[in-house]
Amino acid sequence: MKKRVMILGGDGFCGWPTSLYLSGKGHEILIVDNLSRRNIDNELEASSLTPIQPMGIRLQAWKEVSGQEIRFMNFDVSQHYHRLLTLIREFRPDAIIHFAEQRAAPYSMKSSWHKRYTVNNNLNATNNVLAAVVEAQIDVHIIHLGTMGVYGYGTAGMKIPEGYLKVKMEADEGQTVEQEILYPANPGSIYHMTKTQDQLMFAFYNKNDRVRITDLHQGIVWGTQTENTRMDERLINRFDYDGDYGTVLNRFLMEAAIDYPLSVHGTGGQTRAFINIQDTVRCLEIALESPPEPNERVKIFNQMTETHRVRDLAKLVSELTGAKVDFIPNPRNEADENDLYVANDSFLGHGLKPITLADNLLEEVVDIARRYVDACDTSKIPCSSYWNKEREISQQ
């Protein structure tokens, strides 16, 4: 069934390919974005390796190659509540996909200003969306892109379930009481903390106002292009490699392309969850097609397909490219070593066939990192954000 879908943050790394993918499937798409990610590029003086066109050119290119039109509104959902409310009433979306949050942990830890900006932006955006849906009195399915980081990255000694944990407690009289609760949050940055607070807002609005919500706890996204973004270079997706927004794998690929040692933080024993960008857009489609039933609790999916230790990723990239590996002090306040076992049965049960690093990593090396290598600013690769003063001093 074709749906009206409002995509908040539709100009960003995950939002743009999702917008194209769902538009290509025939859904009516309306993007709302204040272009904050482009403004952060200006602030950091670190742009995408790939050439990102102005929004108007992107939308015109999509119309030319697909015949589909995507509408666009430029405003800040964290600040302009009444514009959001009016738009929801006018557009009457079947679903709202919420990407409109500052997404980088290092950026959220750069300074007190960046911490406050991330909290104000992310929490206000989420609360405004929820409050507007309730005030509009429209049955809208909200799909939120969260993070695996809400669970934390300590070794749990068990497979992390999809959002909810069954616990047993001893009552006063000695009898055992069993409940199912949200998996205990253990954020590792201000950014991750905002995502854990999003969870509580979702739980409340779902319980109090019966808002139908799907929360996707996503792993680190790798890959740049999708079938849609490859259709015209004007549609190309972001490839961030800088120390604030570049994910660990992107940073390794960029370093290898310029013959720079792969910078592994600490021992490289940190285990993280990963997912390819093409699987991300497919997961969003699955979530859109399988909304919660009325009165159903918040539906939580673990949106990841594989886990790897950072040093193993470095070894894989080194074997593909011949790059050397360099171990450097870790700017983050995190465990040097951790295991990570994650349940992801929901998406696999809906037919997701994951793209793995073993399948597509070489393509990413050749098609993106080496092709656009001349656009690289090597001074932006090292991470310049420290989790605390102790970490900063250790780097000096």
Kindly label every feature range from the protein language model.
Residues G24, A256-Q396:
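C-terminal substrate-binding subdomain of Rossmann-fold SDR/epimerase-dehydratase oxidoreductases
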Residues L8, V119-L123, Y191, D242-G246, ...:
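Short, solvent-exposed loop/helix junctions and linker helices
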Residues M1-T224, Y386:
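N-terminal Rossmann-like NAD(P)+-binding domain of SDR-like oxidoreductases, especially those catalyzing
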Residues F75-D76, I88, T118, N237-D244, ...:
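Pocket-edge positions in alpha/beta enzyme catalytic cores
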Residues T126, L130, F202, L249, ...:
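Short-chain dehydrogenase/reductase
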Residues Q197, M201, Y205, F252, ...:
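Hydrophobic alpha-helix immediately C-terminal to the catalytic Tyr-X-X-X-Lys motif of short-chain
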Residues T196, N208-V211, G223-N250, I258-Y260, ...:
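Glycine/proline-rich active-site loop of Rossmann-fold NAD(P)-dependent oxidoreductases
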